[in-house]
């Protein structure tokens, strides 16, 4: 059977991935449209309130030309931008209802996401290929995901 030349990004997909994210220990789940070796990563990231995304930045090729783009398709997300010392430089409210639906940030920008509504769905776009060992550079001073310290951090 030949694979379909298109993939729907619809409410049924949102509901399916959101249900899985609610059951996942991290309270979030990616649904990839790309293969790891693709030049462009394209995926849904579904976040539930209470998930902890350790502040990080991406340094894919060291050229400084990289980016990460977020577009909220359902729900609302808080995006926090940090400097290298871990101080919050900017807080943004991204929502499917607007007025700000998305943002593009440059590589080397430390950031984290906070789910402000249940079943929040964002479409993410960034350069590939995906290299798990090099994908994220975590900001010092913040706990690892899955620890009791992370749970306390998220509660704040």
Where do the language-model regions lie?
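A short, N-terminal "cap"/entry segment at the start of jelly-roll beta-barrel domains
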Residues: 1-44, 92-95
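Conserved short histidine dyad/triad with adjacent acidic residue
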Residues: 26-27, 45-64
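His/acidic/aromatic-lined binding-pocket segments of jelly-roll/cupin-type domains
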Residues: 43-45, 62-72, 103, 113-114
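Glycine- and acidic-residue-biased ligand/ion/polar-headgroup-sensing regions
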Residues: 48, 66-84
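Short beta-strand His + acidic residue motifs that chelate non-heme Fe in jelly-roll/DSBH
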Residues: 55, 79-81, 103-105, 111-116, ...
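Short acidic-glycine-tyrosine-enriched beta hairpin
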Residues: 83-111
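Double-stranded beta-helix
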Residues: 87, 112-156
């Amino acid at each position: 059977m030949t694979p379909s030349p298109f993939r729907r990004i619809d409410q049924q997909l949102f509901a399916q991935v959101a249900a899985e994210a609610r059951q996942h220990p991290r309270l979030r789940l990616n649904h990839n449209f790309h293969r790891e070796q693709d030049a462009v990563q394209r995926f849904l990231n579904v976040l539930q309130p209470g998930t902890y995304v350790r502040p990080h930045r991406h340094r894919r090729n060291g050229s400084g030309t990289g980016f990460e783009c977020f577009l909220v398709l359902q729900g609302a997300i808080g995006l926090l931008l940090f400097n290298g010392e871990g101080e919050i430089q900017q807080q943004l409210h991204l929502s499917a209802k607007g007025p700000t639906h998305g943002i593009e940030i440059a590589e080397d920008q430390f950031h984290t996401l906070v789910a402000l509504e249940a079943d929040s769905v964002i479409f993410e776009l960034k350069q590939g290929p995906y290299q798990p060992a090099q994908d994220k550079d975590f900001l010092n001073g913040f706990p690892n995901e899955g620890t009791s310290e992370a749970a306390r951090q998220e509660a704040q």
